[in-house]
Amino acid sequence: FRLEDSVKLSEIEKKVEEGALSSFLKPPLYSKKQTALTFGKFDGVHIGHRKIFSTLFAKAEEYGLQSAVLSFTLDKDSFFLRERKESLALPDEHFTRLKNAGFQEVFLYSLTESLARMSPEDFVRSILHEALKVKQLVVGTDCSFGYKGEGDVALLKRLQKKYDFTLTVVEKLYTEGEDGQSVPISSSYIRKLLEE
């Protein structure tokens, strides 16, 4: 423990008022056990996310792995990219929803500048492989990560052998839009409906 790592009571009270106490209580980005993991913002935890989660839980059970999720928040202390969209849930609500979804480990982190500038392969190597010991990785088809979101499913497919994990890609779910057309279920679509 270092003095510069300490937090003032007034800062904690302010975080409680903002519904962001979990930003002080987050666990270290490290897992003692090998994991079946998914990562992403998972804003609102909708039915599309739940399809990813159920696939992950099945993989965790099949291979005897710890089920884990790495998610990110864009609170006002975060480094964020040009387009900041309002979140569907406060950080504490988000953490609770993920924990209640059934994950054994929930890692919820602010999107810092260093994380946002990390190359996609560095993210896979240092975070997924070294820190979180990922053996089974489950993502959606539109997965993006690393600097400018340059990492994608194609890159994960190329890196899975090098970093000793198996990738499972879950297809999107669709619903009928207002015009009768098929629309992918996403946090952006839900946010749009809430704005109307």
What is the predicted role of each segment?
Residues 1-196:
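Nucleotidyltransferase catalytic core that binds NTPs
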